[in-house]
Amino acid sequence: MELPNQNELDILLDVATEAVMTAGIILQDLVGNLEKIEEKGRPGDLVTEADKKAEAAVLNILKRRVPHHQILAEESGKLGTLNSDYIWAIDPLDGTTNYAHGYPASSVSVGLLLEGIPIVGAVYNPFRKELFRGAKGSGSTLNYRPIQVSQTTELNQSLLVTGFAYDRRETKDTNYPEFCYLTHITQGVRRGGSASVDLTDVACGRLDGYWERGLSPWDIAAGIVILEEAGGKVTAYDKSPLVIESGRLLATNGHIHNNLSQALDEALPWLKNFYA
């Protein structure tokens, strides 16, 4: 994979920034004023007029500024030039359930993949007024100030975060065992409800690690590059290279990565023994 030059990366990052900030204004205007909330199929998998209006705004910007790129949008699916190596993965409202309830943990996430690898990302949380940006080889920022991951090295000193997939009512393949075990052996596990918020919280050092299953590329593309450029590490659960379409992700400050991966393997046997 040959990266764009620095000037091109800067332009692409500006595109992502314009997109998330524009959508963020829409989310701010509509919060608390939603006329219609729908379920997309599974219980708890919500979509609102805010999702749709924010996504439309992002799509308009991408179609205008990068018309020859492909787009993968949560609500609209695949759009644009489908044979392009550049794919914009967009989640116009990551944390819809939080947003619908007025809980201030949602964001707009816009990431750019090149040959399946995240190279540019912007995440804007309109409730915190926080803009995270990152580009491959260029570092990451929060409101244009450089950020880095935490220096926590011990799992028992770490604060983690996870999420529960929408299909959790339909499958036994959940992360409940890991949640219980890691709550037992760390300083705590949080459940935020927005993958992009979780990833950026690890990127800026508020949290030390994050894992989840049932994710889509638009949930994590932007957050991955922001976290990696802040010094973090992102892999599959077993530390193998991440395939972004796999839906499973382990993301940490790098220092606890091996131990957290091992703990995920230990969780189910521990839980069975705990309740034996």
Task: Go through each PLM region and give its residues.
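N-terminal subdomain of lithium-sensitive/metallo-dependent phosphomonoesterases centered on the IMPase/IPPase/PAP
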Residues: M1-L93, H255, Q262, L271-A276
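Residue-level signal for inorganic ion chemistry
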Residues: A23, L27, D51, L62, ...
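A short, compositionally biased
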Residues: N33, S106, G134-S138, E228, ...
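Solvent-exposed alpha-helices and their adjacent loops that cap or buttress functional pockets
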Residues: E39, G80-L82, H101, E115, ...
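Generic detector of well-ordered alpha-helical packing
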Residues: K52, A56, E75, P92-G95, ...
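DPxDG-like acidic metal-binding loop motif
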Residues: L82-T141
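Residue-level detection of beta-strand-connecting loop/turn positions
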Residues: G116, Y144-P146, K239
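An extended, acidic
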Residues: Q148-A276
